[in-house]
């Protein structure tokens, strides 16, 4: 009988101890969830909500992405970011032609025959335009 009492008290004691551990773990989880919710709320208040549309850079009034930044912000002198080019420069003339005009002894390494398409090697009729539809 004494053995049965001791074992019953032991089981009861271990049950109470394990129950207190479970309650403590539940309390810690609850506190952690509460902390996470408070952090999320504080972030939401700080950034005006968690929507990606609301979290964006501040832009000056009148700013449009289609104009250069120097023109969109008033009060700044215009900044030329492009490099200076020689007078008469056009990007539609080949550099070989420019060099040959400057140096009469220059010969280009390749010559495109007039009327020959460099893409397919086919002759095009005079006045041909790929943009004109007959």
UniProtKB/Swiss-Prot annotation:
Residues 24-71 are annotated as: Disordered. Expressed by the skin glands. Expression levels in inguinal glands are much higher than in granular glands. The keyword Iron does not apply. Pfam families: FSAP_sig_propep. It comes from the Eukaryota. Residues 23-44, 71-82, 99-121 form a propeptide. InterPro entries: Frog_antimicrobial_propeptide. The keyword 4Fe-4S does not apply. Keywords: Amphibian defense peptide, Bradykinin receptor impairing toxin, Cleavage on pair of basic residues, G-protein coupled receptor impairing toxin, Hydroxylation, Secreted, Signal, Toxin. Residues 24-33 have a biased composition (Basic and acidic residues). GO terms for cellular component: extracellular region. GO terms for biological process: defense response. It is found in: Secreted. The modification 4-hydroxyproline is found at residue 126. GO terms for molecular function: toxin activity. Residues 1-22 form the signal peptide. Belongs to the frog skin active peptide (FSAP) family. Bradykinin-related peptide subfamily. This is Bradykinin-related peptides. It comes from Physalaemus nattereri. The gene is BBN.
């Amino acid at each position: 009988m004494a053995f049965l009492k001791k074992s019953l008290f032991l089981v009861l004691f271990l049950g109470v101890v394990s129950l207190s551990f479970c309650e403590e773990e539940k309390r810690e989880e609850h506190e952690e969830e509460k902390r996470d919710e408070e952090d999320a709320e504080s972030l939401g208040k700080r950034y005006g909500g968690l929507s990606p549309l609301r979290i964006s850079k501040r832009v000056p009034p009148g700013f449009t992405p289609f104009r250069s930044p120097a023109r969109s912000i008033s009060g700044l002198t215009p900044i030329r970011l492009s490099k200076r080019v020689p007078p008469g420069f056009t990007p539609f003339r080949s550099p070989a032609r420019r060099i040959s005009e400057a140096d009469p002894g220059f010969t280009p390494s390749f010559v495109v025959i007039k009327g020959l398409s460099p893409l397919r090697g086919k002759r095009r009729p005079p006045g041909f335009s790929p943009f004109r539809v007959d």
